[in-house]
């Protein structure tokens, strides 16, 4: 396991590491508490001062907030390099976005090795999944 970044809990009882393909939490003795997979190398990890959340940023620029207690991903956030567009989404698909930010994500569905995958932009499902209020409450 090659560690890219580390963060220490405020009470020094445990720490979090970012690696290629995961964020992991260990106790003071070095025993694993949880392992949360990622789709990319984790470049940075931070623990909130109240030890409630872990923030990670991966090599693609996607930020993820995880629950400190179990590593569950609560919210994803992608700010585009143009500084104007962004999108935030939950693992269940609810999202909020800046104007034109909906174009940044969608669902990629594989259809087998001999067929091209399908891509469904998130905006196709706006009426069901665009829920700014749900996204805003996630980190409360």
Show which residues each predicted segment covers:
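Residue-level detector of Asp-centered blade-edge/turn motifs that repeat once per structural unit
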Residues: 10-11, 49-50
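Structural recognition of the beta-propeller blade-terminating site
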Residues: 26-27, 67
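Eukaryotic protein-protein interaction scaffolds centered on beta-propeller repeats
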Residues: 1-4, 21, 33, 60-140
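Hydrophobic core register within WD40 beta-propeller blades
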Residues: 6-8, 45
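Blade-loop segments of beta-propeller domains
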Residues: 39-42
């Amino acid at each position: 396991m090659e560690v890219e970044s580390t963060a220490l809990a405020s009470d020094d009882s445990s720490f979090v590491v970012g690696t290629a393909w995961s964020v992991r939490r260990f106790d003071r003795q070095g025993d694993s508490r949880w392992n949360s997979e990622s789709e990319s190398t984790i470049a940075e990890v931070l623990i909130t001062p109240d030890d409630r959340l872990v923030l990670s940023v991966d090599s693609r620029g996607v930020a993820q907030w995880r629950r400190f207690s179990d590593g569950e991903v609560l919210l994803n956030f992608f700010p585009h390099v143009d500084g104007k567009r962004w999108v935030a989404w939950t693992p269940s698909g609810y999202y909020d976005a800046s104007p034109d930010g909906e174009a940044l994500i969608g669902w990629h569905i594989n259809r087998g090795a001999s067929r091209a995958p399908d891509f469904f932009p998130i905006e196709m499902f706006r009426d069901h999944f665009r829920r700014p209020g749900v996204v805003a409450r996630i980190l409360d």
